[in-house]
Amino acid sequence: MDKIKITIDSKIGNVVTISYNLEKITIDVTPKKKKEKDVLLAQSVAVEEAKDVKVEEKNIIDIEDDDDMDIENT
């Protein structure tokens, strides 16, 4: 008996392969491989986020308590 194979390849999902004959049915699900372009885009976004964090760190103002005023509980 010939084996029948169906492959479903989605642009956004996993690759699903269904193989069957009269004796058994096999379903394989594999994660979609990222294209090199998508990986480079993700890396550039990560670099931009890192730059944003550095800018935010520069804008932090430290407030020091030097007024010598103590609060006493009575």
Curated annotation (Swiss-Prot):
GO BP of this protein: symbiont-mediated suppression of host adaptive immune response; symbiont-mediated suppression of host gene expression; symbiont-mediated suppression of host translation initiation
Protein family per UniProt: Belongs to the orthopoxvirus OPG173 protein family.
Keywords from the named record: Early protein, Eukaryotic host gene expression shutoff by virus, Eukaryotic host translation shutoff by virus, Host cytoplasm, Host gene expression shutoff by virus, Host-virus interaction, Inhibition of eukaryotic host translation factors by virus, Inhibition of host adaptive immune response by virus, Viral immunoevasion
Induction per the UniProt record: Expressed in the early phase of the viral replicative cycle.
The keyword Isomerase appears for this protein: no
Job description of the protein: Plays a role in the inhibition of host protein synthesis. Specifically, inhibits the initiation of cap-dependent and cap-independent translation. In turn, affects the outcome of infection by decreasing recruitment of inflammatory leukocytes and reducing the memory CD8+ T-cell response.
Source species of the chain: Monkeypox virus
Subcellular location: Host cytoplasm
Keyword field contains Ribonucleoprotein: no
Protein name: Protein OPG173
GO cellular component: host cell cytoplasm
Domain of life, per lineage: Viruses
